[in-house]
Amino acid sequence: MLFENSQDNWEIDLPSNITNIGLKISGGADSAIVCYMLAKYVMEERPDITIHPVTGIADNKLYQQKYADSVLRKVEELTGIVFGKHQYKDVTATRYILDQEDFLKSLYEQELFNLHFAGITANPSEDDAPQLYTSINAMPTDDRSKQLIKKDNYRLPLINIDKRGVAEHYTRLGVMDTLFPVTRSCEAKVTDLEYNINEHCEV
């Protein structure tokens, strides 16, 4: 199945021996659209595949389970798919990446799935978002360089597109008014002076 995008197309065609896949989902707009695309692929081409949602709930972002669940229920409503049991675990903010890696490793050891997907996107260019490059704490610290979508046992279908490309996927797939509103697209931490996780961001 081909998902076209002006920044980078994504084609998914999993081998027939892959029948269980993991999906890292936070409740944000990026992982939500990957969730929808995978569900659409499963429903239309590979009904033998089970998608297993995985959420690491950071201690400074306690809303992640709530919004991840909202996304899953909406995608089930839109596609008719039934997800596998939602796997989630509390993780420490200061060890967020390491704790998530350990969590995923434990799920692989249980042979719950053969590979997993994540909704990591590309960073905008410095010309498009100079403010992100002037704040030392603003840019993500994980590797978001332009790279192959396939890497080892995980897949990053959005790694070569930025937030505008994500919005384009929502528009092309016709879910901007149905799926996007149930996502949590802005960052908030429980230590923030204004901790309002119910106010949505604009695209």
Regions found by a protein language model. Give the residues of each.
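Nucleotide-activated chemistry modules centered on ATP-dependent adenylation/adenylyltransferase
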Residues: 1-203
